[in-house]
């Protein structure tokens, strides 16, 4: 059996539209062994919340860099617009259960697969201009990149991102603008004391970086 067949999603993919992407969330999660033992799976909870909102998220739990590479292609093929990654991180790298992946390697794995899509990363300290610039260097068409600017607790992360998606999709279930994302992130970042780094295009088409709230 192929690896991707074994990693069946918790949800059913929507059919591709002929033009553009579909406004759904593709969730990839990879935590350490202690998190697994204690069932601390933010992404799994988030998928359940999204289904309650009437969305059709795809959720995959992985453990290795090789599986992440397969997920990158699967995300691209899904035509889903929003990629949410839940994992451990630092100011220079992200981690799967068994492998460390520096920012440059992550950007290479997703090269060409984020055009016209938005990236949300729930990982400690991954919210910085270095990460966003490296991702964009391999994906000129990426719309935005958002991630915590400092370390974030598990309970805060699951409450933060669940609230973000519920609020954003309750306003418009078909799309989210960068201005709307910033407007929703600001009060949440202040409420939880968790600043978020958001990289996006301004009205002139210039790529800009900024930290919101906290």
Locations of the language-model features?
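A domain-level signal for caspase-like cysteine endopeptidase catalytic cores
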Residues: 2-80, 122
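Short acidic, S/G/P-rich loop/turn micro-motifs used as interaction or catalytic elements
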Residues: 32-36, 65-67, 89-93, 125-128, ...
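Short, flexible/disordered intra-domain loops and linkers
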Residues: 33-38, 94-98, 173-174
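A generic structural motif
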Residues: 60-62, 145-152, 199-201
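A glycine-rich, hydrophobic loop/mini-helix early in the fold
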Residues: 72-106
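Catalytic cores of nucleophile-dependent amide-cleaving enzymes
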Residues: 98-159
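Caspase-like cysteine protease fold
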Residues: 100-109, 171-214
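Short, small-residue alpha-helix embedded
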Residues: 158-170
């Amino acid at each position: 059996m192929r690896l991707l067949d074994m990693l069946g999603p918790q949800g059913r993919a929507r059919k591709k539209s002929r033009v553009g992407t579909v406004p759904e969330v593709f969730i990839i999660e990879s935590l350490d062994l202690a998190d697994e033992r204690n069932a601390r799976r933010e992404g799994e909870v988030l998928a359940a919340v999204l289904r309650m909102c009437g969305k059709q998220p795809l959720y995959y739990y992985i453990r290795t860099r090789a599986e992440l590479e397969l997920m990158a292609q699967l995300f691209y093929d899904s035509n889903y617009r929003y990629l949410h990654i839940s994992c451990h991180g630092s100011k220079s790298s992200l981690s799967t259960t068994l492998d460390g992946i520096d920012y440059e390697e992550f950007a290479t794995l997703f090269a060409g697969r984020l055009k016209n899509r938005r990236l949300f990363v729930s990982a400690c300290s991954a919210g910085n201009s270095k990460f966003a610039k490296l991702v964009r260097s391999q994906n000129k068409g990426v719309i935005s990149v958002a991630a915590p600017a400092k370390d974030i607790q598990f309970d805060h992360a699951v409450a933060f991102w669940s609230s973000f998606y519920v609020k954003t999709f309750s306003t418009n279930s078909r799309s989210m603008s960068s201005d709307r994302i910033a407007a929703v992130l600001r009060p949440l970042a202040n409420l939880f004391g968790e600043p978020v780094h958001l990289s996006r295009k301004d009205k002139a088409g210039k790529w800009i970086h900024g930290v919101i709230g906290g």
